């Protein structure tokens, strides 16, 4: 949040959306399953981790995953639960790994406002905005579980196999992340202690 603040922006509401994997070839539960796959991942840190697991990376927006899988440019992808459903990726894959109990991927989706605009408001308006932000945050937290369920339901209905990570699978990804994305993150942001707390 300090980085956001320093950029002249205020966070009105926090939200974290879950996501997972899908593949044309096999279920992706652990790093060994990603080895040799050509993946689209959501963000630099996840790219670093997948490369560390032996996957090839193709960068593209989530709106192009369907075509990437259809044309053979990709064998697998990582994106949010919502995108997995809205882009009908279930039409192109054999197996999907929803967040489940040991979700690996989360996307930060805050509601932001320019600090300059916020500070131009009077105290009453500022309080009202912050209160509305908390209401939005509570609502979004409740909806996240619904997005994950829609992901599972849509893929099950399409006949796609669903796979779930175990604690051991999750731990194997964390070990790869420590050598790749965590290391790169710590070089830019002094947050390694926080990463260790969460893993």
What are these model-derived regions, one by one?
Residues 2-199:
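N-terminal secretory/targeting leader peptides
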């Amino acid at each position: 949040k300090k980085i956001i603040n320093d950029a002249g922006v205020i966070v009105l509401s926090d939200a974290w959306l879950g996501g997972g994997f899908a593949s044309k070839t096999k279920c992706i539960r652990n790093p060994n399953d990603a080895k040799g796959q050509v993946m689209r991942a959501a963000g630099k840190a996840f790219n670093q981790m997948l490369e560390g697991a032996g996957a090839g990376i193709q960068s593209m927006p989530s709106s192009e995953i369907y075509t990437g899988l259809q044309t053979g440019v990709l064998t697998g992808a990582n994106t949010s639960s919502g995108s997995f459903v809205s882009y009908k990726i279930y039409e192109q894959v054999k197996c999907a790994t929803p967040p489940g109990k040991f979700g690996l991927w989360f996307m930060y989706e805050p509601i932001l406002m320019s600090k300059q605009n916020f500070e131009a408001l009077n105290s009453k308006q500022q309080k009202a905005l912050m209160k509305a932000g908390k209401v939005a945050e509570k609502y979004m937290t409740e909806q996240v579980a619904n997005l994950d369920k829609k992901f599972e339901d849509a893929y099950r209905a399409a006949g796609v196999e669903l796979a779930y990570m175990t604690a051991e699978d999750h731990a194997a990804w964390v070990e790869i992340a420590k050598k790749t994305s965590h290391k790169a993150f710590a070089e830019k942001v002094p947050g390694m202690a926080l990463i260790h707390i969460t893993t």
